[in-house]
Every structure is written in structure tokens, then in C-alpha cells.
Amino acid sequence: MMNRVEEEKGNELGEGHTFIYQKYIDYLEENKFVDYPRMVQLAVAALRKKSPAVTVLISRFHHILIDEYQDINLSQKQMIDGLLTKQSNMWVVGDDDQAIYGWRGSDISFLLNFEREYAFTERFTLTINYRSGDLIIGASSRLAKNLQSRFEKNFSGDRQVKGEIRF
């Protein structure tokens, strides 16, 4: 298994932050505490062993639903893959324009490559935003077009809004 600090720190932590994070990991281990990322890692390790108990557990999951798929990290992806069987049905929701957890190791490529990785995938793109009007949707769409890795899409709001946006 990958060193926890290396796996979770993402690409943006400097040496000072890495030192502090290592102290945090040491504290957890000394006190026999388990945080959420460690729970995921332990689940991945158990799933890889394929013990009879794990096999029975996995057989109970026929449908897997994942929200905010654009924000999963490598450990979470490994856990998801470990839960899948040939009979599994997986339904994910993700928005490549809203990937915000790169600082903690999330990887947008898992969403962008989803259709290549999982057979029989069908994508539905929701193009009408019922939360915001055309003014905000237009501005955010122009901004999102500058993102390096994203699906091409066109959005519209469900109502006309007058005004102006100032930065």
C-alpha cells in the first residue's frame, strides 16, 4: 500500500505542510485512532484479500450509487472497484466543472475516463440549471471553458435574469 502521506497530500502541499500532516498521522497511529481516509484504505485492503466474508459482503451489493464522482481520490476509486462484480450496476453523478478537491488528492480523470473504463456506460448531460438564471449560467460557462480537462457542454438557465455581473 502507498505511503499515506504521499497518497493523500495531493500535489499542492509544501514541505512544511507535509511535516505537519505526518505529525497528524503519527498522532492517529499512536492513539489507535482511525480517520475517514484510513477507513477507506482499510476497506481497500480487506477487499483485496477476497476472504469468504468479504465475498459474501460484496455479493449483497447489486447497485452502487456515487454522488460527486468528480471529487473521488485513488483510495476511494480502489474501494469502488473492489465492491464491483460482473453483476453490479453502478450509477454515478459528477460535474467536471465542479472538481474542487484536488488539494486532497481527488482526480478528475476518474470522471473524464469513466466511459472508457466501464463497459456499457450511458451518459446523461443535464443542460438546464433550475437554480440560477441565464446571466449567471452564461458567465460561469464562459469561465469553465478555460478549464483544461472537461467535457464539452452547453448550459442554460430556466429563466431570464436582468442585471450585470461584476468581478
Give the ranges of each region predicted by the language model:
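Hydrophobic beta-strand segment of the Class I
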Residues: 64
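Walker B catalytic acidic pair
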Residues: 60, 68, 95
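A basic/glycine-biased coupling hinge at the interface between accessory DNA-binding modules
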Residues: 1-61, 88, 108, 164
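Residue-level detector of secondary-structure boundary/capping sites
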Residues: 12-16, 34, 71, 105, ...
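Conserved RecA-like helicase ATPase core segment
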Residues: 74-167
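Glutamine-centric residue-chemistry signal
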Residues: 25-28, 70, 76, 98
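Residue-level signature of catalytic and energy-coupling elements of molecular machines
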Residues: 35, 67, 136
